[in-house]
Amino acid sequence: MVRRSVTLPQLQAKKALGEPITMLTAWDYLWARLLDAAGVDVILVGDSLGMVALGYPTTLPVTLDQMIHHAQAVRRGVSHSFLVCDLPFLSYQESPEQALRSAGRLIKEAEVQAVKMEGASPVVQAATRRLVEAGIPVLGHVGLLPQRVHQLGGWRQQGNTPQDAAAILAGALALAEAGVFAVILEHIPAALAQQITAQLKIPTIGIGAGPHCDGQVLVTADVLGLSPQVPPFAKVYADLGTQAIAAIENYCQAVKSRQFP
């Protein structure tokens, strides 16, 4: 069977069809090629690459130029998956026009197909409208917002009070009204995610938000056992970190003992 490229209308249609959307992150050509070959629906060049690939403690130091650099590498490894890229911290919060310039660079220079912004503030809502008007698809993101980690006091679950839950629901509805094609629900109670999913016509993609979303996303390094610390909501499907260290140790020993080459 010939595999076709994933399109935005196909992703949105999956909600009505009851077909869960799969999404994982990539930060270079190697991982993009592997995810694409595995049939992942959506590949996200997340600003989590700041922590996974660049060694920062948070996503905040990542620049737009760095995102473009990594997205260009990912683009070269993608043949079929739909490609989305994060707008990093302070590349869109100033104004809708700043967001348009930043997103435009990702579209033109890295050939991504959509961008993601965090939160549902008035500026983000206005920026979403501006980007959609310009023909740039936007993925929303509510709940735990990594770009606000200091403001939130860490990587804690959000939406645990009635007021916070109502604000997250209102934010998701506002983003849908502004024109996002889907919304990520990060680290919120499963019941809240279920409520949001039921009220939205667009797909919801969960990360630590329970089983009721229209799709799921995780950081690939967490899935493959490559992260030193894995979030409590993630599942490790392979321990590649341990296997890689063992393989490298075997290589070094073989060289030192002159068993290789």
Curated annotation (Swiss-Prot):
InterPro entries: Pantoate_hydroxy_MeTrfase (IPR003700), Pyrv/PenolPyrv_kinase-like_dom (IPR015813), Pyrv_kinase-like_dom_sf (IPR040442). Keywords: Cytoplasm, Magnesium, Metal-binding, Pantothenate biosynthesis, Transferase. The keyword Metal-binding applies. GO terms for molecular function: 3-methyl-2-oxobutanoate hydroxymethyltransferase activity; magnesium ion binding. 3-methyl-2-oxobutanoate binds at D47, S48, D86, K116. Its main location: cytoplasm. Its cofactor is Mg(2+). It catalyses: 3-methyl-2-oxobutanoate + (6R)-5,10-methylene-5,6,7,8-tetrahydrofolate + H2O = 2-dehydropantoate + (6S)-5,6,7,8-tetrahydrofolate. Pfam families: Pantoate_transf (PF02548). The keyword Magnesium applies. Pathway: Cofactor biosynthesis; (R)-pantothenate biosynthesis; (R)-pantoate from 3-methyl-2-oxobutanoate: step 1/2. Its EC number is 2.1.2.11. It is found in: Cytoplasm. Binds 1 Mg(2+) ion per subunit. The active site is at E186 (proton acceptor). Gene3D superfamilies: Phosphoenolpyruvate-binding domains (3.20.20.60). GO terms for biological process: pantothenate biosynthetic process. One of its GO terms (cellular component) is cytoplasm. Mg(2+) binds at D47, D86, E118. Belongs to the PanB family. HAMAP family: PanB. Homodecamer; pentamer of dimers. Catalyzes the reversible reaction in which hydroxymethyl group from 5,10-methylenetetrahydrofolate is transferred onto alpha-ketoisovalerate to form ketopantoate. This is 3-methyl-2-oxobutanoate hydroxymethyltransferase. It comes from Thermosynechococcus vestitus (strain NIES-2133 / IAM M-273 / BP-1). The gene is panB.
